[in-house]
């Protein structure tokens, strides 16, 4: 909604028979400032979200669930950029609505549709991370679950945006300069405006906020609980084998790192949504229910809210650059990847073998009288466990290393 044009148009009530016609709203310094801010937000949002979409489409193979969600979020943010920000720029430049009644209804519908979609995709990101952390064993169900959430986000956005097309219409008033057209709401009573404002507040902010905050509180609780269990669980020296180290700790550790990394990114996206939109909805509440009459304040905070579509691609880009930089730093420290072998005996003694995969050289630290069972590679938790080359895993009955291979 263009609150500046709308309020100026609405507040100029007059008696035609007793007072002269007022001046029509005109382009002034307020509009200049608004155009500069909105223009900057639009350019950054357009190029940022376009690059995110291109980057995700260039990914080979199947996309992960978080990548599918980020793709849809970028599409939703592009819709906000065009149907909210760009339309507001054009409308501010012309001051008057010049596109007719049909376009008034269509554009108002698309304006709210983009906001709903961006909000519900952000909620889906929070839910996806919540399922990933709370129920890691259901990874196979994640793609279907995400497709359902994305579909629901699009369908609900389309349904909840319908009232906007019904409420808004082109209206005309006579000013001294002539007939003035504006696209604005057509409530017949104050309670209608308050009812629609309350429903918009609940559907676009309150319910999504509750879901997102609850999801990340559950994530935080689970991570803290898991960390305590990991540090507090003692390792049994009589039953631990290389196989249990590999598939019980190493593999879980790698998956946990991947989940936590994507959870951090999605947490920042959710935090940006809350920080950008909370001030606007507080002002919106006073504007709708307490008859605050400061349209310019609403404009400032609505611009802050729509700038969320500019921040999301910057957040995704920052995490992508950090991931690449971290990967290159790791490669610089170990160009070919260091292969760490862990060999554990039933007495709890261990030996480690560090092998450089490029040169094939390696070094082993052995303990005299040690019983070697199996070894595993930390660099590939999916690799089958097998004895280390050059070290016989057969033990003598007394548990000591044989001096030569048997038979």
UniProtKB/Swiss-Prot annotation:
Disulfide cysteine pairs (residue numbers): 104-183
UniProt signal peptide: none
Any Pfam family the entry gives: 7tm_1
UniProt cross-references to PROSITE patterns, sorted A to Z: G_PROTEIN_RECEP_F1_2 (PS50262)
The keyword Membrane is assigned to this record: yes
Membrane topology listed for this record: Multi-pass membrane protein
Transmembrane segments: 37-57, 70-90, 106-126, 148-168, 200-220, 269-289, 299-319
Record InterPro entries: GPCR_Rhodpsn, GPCR_Rhodpsn_7TM
Region (Disordered) residue spans: 377-407
GO terms under biological process: cellular response to hormone stimulus
Extracellular side: 1-36, 91-105, 169-199, 290-298
Protein origin, superkingdom: Eukaryota
Keywords associated with the record: Cell membrane, Disulfide bond, G-protein coupled receptor, Glycoprotein, Membrane, Receptor, Transducer, Transmembrane, Transmembrane helix
Residues that carry a glycan: 5, 11, 15
Major location (coarse): membrane
Family: Belongs to the G-protein coupled receptor 1 family.
Record PANTHER family: ADIPOKINETIC HORMONE RECEPTOR, ISOFORM C, NEUROPEPTIDE RECEPTOR-RELATED G-PROTEIN COUPLED RECEPTOR
Record-given protein name: Gonadotropin-releasing hormone receptor
Gene responsible for this protein: GNRHR
């Amino acid at each position: 909604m263009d609150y500046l044009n709308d309020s100026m148009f609405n507040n100029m009530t007059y008696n035609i028979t007793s007072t002269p016609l007022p001046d029509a709203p005109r382009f002034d310094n307020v509009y200049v400032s608004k155009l500069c801010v909105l223009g900057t937000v639009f350019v950054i949002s357009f190029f940022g979200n376009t690059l995110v979409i291109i980057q995700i489409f260039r990914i080979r193979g199947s996309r992960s669930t978080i990548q599918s969600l980020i793709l849809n979020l970028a599409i939703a943010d592009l819709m906000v950029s065009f149907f909210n920000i760009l339309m507001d720029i054009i409308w501010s430049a012309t001051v008057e609505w010049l596109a007719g009644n049909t376009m008034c209804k269509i554009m108002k519908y698309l304006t709210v549709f983009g906001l709903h979609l961006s909000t519900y995709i952000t909620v889906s990101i929070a839910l996806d991370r919540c399922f990933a952390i709370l129920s890691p064993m259901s990874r196979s169900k994640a793609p279907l679950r995400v497709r359902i959430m994305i579909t629901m986000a699009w369908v609900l956005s389309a349904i909840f945006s319908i009232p906007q097309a019904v409420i808004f219409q082109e209206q005309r008033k006579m000013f001294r300069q002539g007939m003035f057209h504006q696209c604005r709401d057509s409530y017949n009573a104050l309670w209608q405006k308050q009812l629609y404002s309350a429903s918009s507040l609940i559907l676009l902010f309150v319910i999504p906020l509750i879901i997102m905050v609850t999801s990340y509180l559950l994530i935080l609780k689970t991570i803290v609980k898991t960390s305590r269990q990991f540090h507090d669980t003692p390792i049994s020296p009589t039953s631990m084998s290389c196989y249990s180290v590999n598939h019980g700790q190493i593999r879980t550790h790698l998956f946990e790192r991947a989940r936590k990394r994507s959870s951090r990114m999605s947490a920042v996206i959710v935090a940006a949504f809350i920080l950008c939109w909370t001030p606007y909805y507080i002002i919106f509440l006073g504007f709708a229910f307490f008859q605050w009459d400061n349209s310019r304040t609403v404009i400032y905070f609505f611009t802050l809210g729509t700038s969320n579509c500019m921040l999301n691609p910057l957040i995704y880009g920052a995490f992508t650059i950090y991931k690449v930089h971290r990967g290159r730093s790791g490669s610089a420290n170990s160009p070919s990847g260091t292969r760490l072998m862990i060999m554990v005996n039933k007495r709890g003694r261990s030996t480690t073998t560090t092998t450089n995969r490029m040169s094939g050289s390696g070094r082993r630290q052995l303990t005299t009288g040690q019983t070697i069972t199996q070894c595993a590679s930390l660099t590939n938790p999916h690799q089958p466990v097998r004895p280390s080359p050059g070290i016989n895993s057969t033990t003598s009955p007394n548990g000591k290393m044989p001096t030569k291979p048997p038979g």
